[in-house]
Amino acid sequence: MMLPSYLHFAIRKKVLAIFIVLLIISAYLGFAPALPVPINDKVCHFFVFFLLTLVFYWVFDLSRRRATQLTILVCGVFGGLGSEFVQSFLTYRTFDLFDIVANLLGCSLALLLNILYHKRRLEKIRLQRYGHVPTIADDLEMQASAAEEEEEGEEDVSKSTP
């Protein structure tokens, strides 16, 4: 059976390994009865989901739109919301709406940074591949400079002829 074309993508193995290590550390921090270091719970939620989202976005070699959609689904919905619902079933952890807010803020900031960097990276690759492609504004500037050069040439000719 052939897979649809949108399911053909590469996995960046080194990034996946980093993500798995971060996920194991996050799971330990999220489901441990008490944190080993005294830290604000909301700050911890923010940074954990910021890092997870920052790394997960680059695990699969996808277009910017597909990477964004997959990251929102996995990190935002399953990670940010799902982990809090799982904690509500644990006897030593409690459900906290502000934890979800911190999770989603961390995801959102990392996703925004990833999107901006991805867009910039694609533009740089496009410029390297195709060079500078003139736009309408560039074309108008070239026409104006050509007209100025033509006028200067006519002035030079009129000055040289008596």
Swiss-Prot record:
Keyword Cell wall biogenesis/degradation: no
Domain of life of the source: Eukaryota
Membrane topology, record value: Multi-pass membrane protein
Membrane-spanning segments: 15-35, 43-63, 70-90, 97-117
Keywords: Membrane, Transmembrane, Transmembrane helix
Cellular-component GO terms for this entry: Golgi apparatus; membrane
Location(s) in or outside the cell: Membrane
Keyword Membrane: yes
Name of the molecule in the record: Uncharacterized protein C11E3.10
Organism (species): Schizosaccharomyces pombe (strain 972 / ATCC 24843) (Fission yeast)
